[in-house]
Amino acid sequence: MSEHDHLDDLRAVTAGSLALDGLAPDAYARDHTAFEALSNQRRLIEDWLVDRLASSSDASLSVLAVGCGDGALDAAVAERLLASDPAGRALRYVGIEPFETSARHFDERMGRINSDRLSFDTVVAPFAQTSLDETFDVVTFVHSMYYVPDVAEAAHAATALLRAGGEALVLNAPRGALNLLAGLLAPAIEGHQQWFSDDVHDALTCSGLDVAVPAPIEAVVDLTDASDGVLDFTVQATLTPESRCLVRRYLADVSLVAGRSVVAHPVDVFAVRGARVPSSAPT
């Protein structure tokens, strides 16, 4: 059977039944960590962010991480930025995370970084419900734009928090072979399906924002021996035994490596620019 046959089987299995349950916050956090361990994507994102943020020439750098999770990515980025500039600029990090346990881990990870040039805060709330009294050089949405009610509103809110010359960076999954599963099986979030890259691109470009699209980050994930929980995270739903079996067969069919379930795991990047730095007045 082809991957299309397995997708058709999944559609048939789910068509006559209630929508699959979503993931409980604790299970989401646990299985997210396990999923990331099977992919090289997070390290590639870390490298990309370090290069992007290090290119700023400002005397200090402030970052707002929307949907920061447990801080594994942001703490690694912060440590590398500080280490690469040992006598240099101050670094400010603010993480927004609705899940309290993950937010606490973000706070703990940042607190373990031994540098008096780092300051940080954590806000436990959805992005739409936050009220911040500071501005930032960079706002990041790393795999978090899926969950906002309205992409354009979130992007406009992010750009309103930018300093002159700043940018919002949205890193989002395309609707490729891997995420066809989530598109088919994941339950709605606050009345909408998860936003994939085509949705994000359309929302950003149609809302009048200044958007650049750098090259995607190409990665792979090896789900050959993935646990049931990791498969649930992969599709963003709690699978039934029957649907889980079909998911495993589908992954084997779309694998880049014969005899395994190694699947393309790319991430697209959107750079939304804030207001330009005002030019100097003529003399």
Q: Positions of the model-derived regions?
A:
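A short SAM/SAH-binding and catalytic strip from SAM-dependent methyltransferases
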Residues: 137-152
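Conserved class I S-adenosyl-L-methionine
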Residues: 167-195
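Class I SAM-dependent methyltransferase Rossmann-like catalytic core
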Residues: 2-56
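A short glycine-rich, Lys/Arg-flanked "PGG" loop and its adjoining helix->strand segment in the class I
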Residues: 152-167
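A short acidic, Gly/Pro-enriched loop at the edge of an enzyme's catalytic core
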Residues: 128-139
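Short alpha-helix
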Residues: 192-208
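Class I SAM-dependent methyltransferase SAM/SAH-binding core
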Residues: 62-129
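Conserved Class I S-adenosyl-L-methionine
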Residues: 210-283
